[in-house]
Amino acid sequence: MTTACLMSTYQPLALSFTRGLGTRLWDQSGREYLDAVAGVAVTNVGHSHPMLVDAIRDQAGLLLHTSNLYSIDWQQRLAQKLTRLAGMDRVFFNNSGAEANETALKLARLHGWHKYIEQPLVVVMENAFHGRTLGTLAASDGPAVRLSYSDLPGDYIKVPFGDLLAFDKVCVTHGHRIAAVLVEPIQGEGGAQVAPAGYLKALRERCTRRDWLLMLDEIQTGMGRTGKWFAFQHEGIVPDVMTLAKGLGNGVPIGACLARGKAAELFTPGSHGSTFGGNPLACRVGCTVIDIIEQQALVENAGVRGQHLLGRLQEVLGGHPQVMQVRGRGLMIGIELREAIPELTRIAAEQHGLLINVTRGKVIRLLPPLVLEAAEVEQIVQGLAASLDSASYRALERSA
């Protein structure tokens, strides 16, 4: 396999897939794998779902693109479904999570300017990740920001995730310039870190009191992954702005920025736009994904299977010498290791037919499709335990 013609932005495994079905993928030699990554929280309804395949085929034969110069029926339908599920008022469609977050950041600036703040600030979290555009990188934290680019937009102030005392200190020193707060309910790239109970509700109260926009990045957590349609619903709150992507399209590129109240009224014609955003194909796919999730009760399945998986991982790996902590919510689970094991993803795939992801160097991130079955929970647990044992044994051999 050659990558000579591709820019060097990834270091992929020497593994290529030719087809998928449900939670399974098959490589070029016909070997089967259990997919516990789901394209990084994307293929929530599984690979090659027949309803989705039919919708894509049908729409491709009818109409792919017209632009937002004209009304798009499927765009209206998807907006109605999303606002109903989320308790929001309006939607702007684009093509990715980064674009959705850029839209949210524009809303934050507009909100600040409407409050006569010359240089509005957005409060963001340490270890956050919101995308790879310059604006969203500046709002993020971690190696991608520190090592790659300088002179990023500086209208952000970072606070430790989950630390209300630190947040309140920032409110005292910078409150007159703050326009919005941007936070992930569960930090995905940050290592599947779940916001402490009551944290989002406390942010909601503070934002309401100070007329700041509470903006939630639900790009990984949204569309049922945590056992609710959206992770904020675990806290019984509603944000002012929410961003979606990934699972909304199940592999077809789509992003969405939802807003309510005054945040939904900030844009005017010409103030933002997207050539491909909200095209008929992507929006029909989004509608079909929602229909599948509702018809197959996949939100509920994510909650049940996620609780089962988390419990079994804690039982089996809780005492493993390489494991520090097992955490998560629904089917978004992180296993933090004591040290990095560079070969772990390769060992899991090659020896145990299990696809996993590692973030922050030493946090195994499990994001299986929401169609996961009970027997597959045990397959993930046993495959992961065996992979850790194999990797640990190899490390001991090398050090001997």
Swiss-Prot record:
Subcellular location: Cytoplasm
EC number of this enzyme: 2.6.1.11
Residues bound to pyridoxal 5'-phosphate: G97, A98, F129, D217, E218, I219, Q220, T275
Pathway assigned to this chain's UniProt record: Amino-acid biosynthesis; L-arginine biosynthesis; N(2)-acetyl-L-ornithine from L-glutamate: step 4/4
Record-linked SUPFAM superfamilies: PLP-dependent transferases
GO biological process: L-arginine biosynthetic process
Subunit structure: Homodimer.
HAMAP family in UniProt: ArgD_aminotrans_3
Protein name per UniProt: Acetylornithine aminotransferase 2
Organism: Pseudomonas syringae pv. tomato (strain ATCC BAA-871 / DC3000)
The encoding gene: argD2
